[in-house]
From Swiss-Prot:
Name of the protein in its database record: Precursor of elicitor peptide 1
Quaternary structure, from the entry: Interacts with its receptor PEPR1.
Feature type site, description Required for ligand-receptor interaction: G86
Alphabetical GO biological process terms: innate immune response; response to ethylene; response to jasmonic acid; response to wounding
Induction / repression: By wounding, methyl jasmonate (MeJA), ethylene. The expression of the peptide PEP1 precursor is induced by the mature peptide PEP1.
Role noted for this protein: Elicitor of plant defense. Induces the production of plant defensin (PDF1.2) and of H(2)O(2). Promotes resistance to the root fungal pathogen P.irregulare. Triggers the expression of several PROSCOOP genes (e.g. PROSCOOP2, PROSCOOP7, PROSCOOP8, PROSCOOP12 and PROSCOOP13).
Gene: PROPEP1
Propeptide: 1-69
The keyword Phosphoprotein is assigned to this record: no
Bias kind Polar residues: ranges: 37-48
UniProtKB keywords: Plant defense
Domain of life: Eukaryota
Region feature (Disordered): 35-92
């Protein structure tokens, strides 16, 4: 009876870790960083190896050139202010 209680307690403690594991796997898959290594396919001639080599080759060939598409805007120049007629308190 004690063993069954221990097993239920131990399995209950693993639930948060399983949830965390599943969440991390989903996030890594979305980012493209998750590579699952299954123990049954340990043969050296797997189809994953050539794909990885092709990805490496394309990563080396890709270059990013940053250019600016913005046009330079010239500031508007103000003309000279008109000289007042000499009458105080009046505006043009």
């Amino acid at each position: 009876m004690e063993k069954s209680d221990r097993r239920s307690e131990e399995s209950h403690l693993w639930i948060p870790l399983q949830c965390l594991d599943q969440t991390l796997r989903a996030i890594l898959k979305c980012l493209g960083l998750f590579h699952q290594d299954s123990p049954t396919t340990s043969s050296p001639g797997t189809s994953k190896q050539p794909k990885e080599e092709k990805e490496d080759v394309t990563m080396e060939k890709e270059e990013v050139v940053v250019t600016s598409r913005a046009t330079k805007v010239k500031a508007k120049q103000r003309g000279k202010e008109k000289v007042s007629s000499g009458r105080p308190g009046q505006h043009n």
